[in-house]
C-alpha cells in the first residue's frame, strides 16, 4: 500500500440531506457532509448553527435522504444557500410531503 501523505479531509463522503419544518410548517433542507452511520440503526450528524438545526431544536424531528448523482445540483444548492434568507425547497423547485413517521418533510 502506498503512503497517501498527510491529509486533513478524507473524500469522497456520503452527503446527507437533512429535512425539517420550521414552526410555521415551512419545509427546509440542508446538505450535511459531516455525517456517518455509527451503529446498525443509527447515524451521527455533526451540525453547526443553520436554519435546519434551529428547526430541529424546535420540532425535535428531521428526515434524512442521500445526495446522489441524479440529485447533485439540488444537493449542492442545499449546501450553499441559506434557509434563513430564502425558501430553498421552493426555489429549487422541489416538492415535499410529510413523513408518515416524524414531523418532517420527505423531499420528492
Located regions from the model:
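Active-site-proximal mixed secondary-structure blocks
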Residues: 1-30, 36-108
Amino acid at each position: 500500500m502506498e503512503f497517501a501523505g498527510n491529509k486533513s479531509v478524507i473524500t469522497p463522503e456520503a452527503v446527507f440531506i437533512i429535512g425539517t419544518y420550521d414552526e410555521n410548517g415551512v419545509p427546509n433542507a440542508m446538505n450535511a457532509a459531516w455525517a456517518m452511520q455509527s451503529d446498525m440503526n443509527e447515524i451521527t450528524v455533526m451540525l453547526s448553527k443553520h436554519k435546519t438545526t434551529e428547526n430541529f431544536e424546535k420540532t425535535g424531528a428531521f428526515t434524512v435522504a442521500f445526495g446522489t448523482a441524479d440529485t447533485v445540483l439540488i444537493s449542492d444548492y442545499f449546501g450553499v444557500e441559506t434557509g434563513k434568507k430564502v425558501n430553498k425547497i421552493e426555489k429549487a423547485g422541489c416538492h415535499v410531503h410529510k413523513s408518515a413517521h416524524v414531523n418532517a418533510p420527505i423531499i420528492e
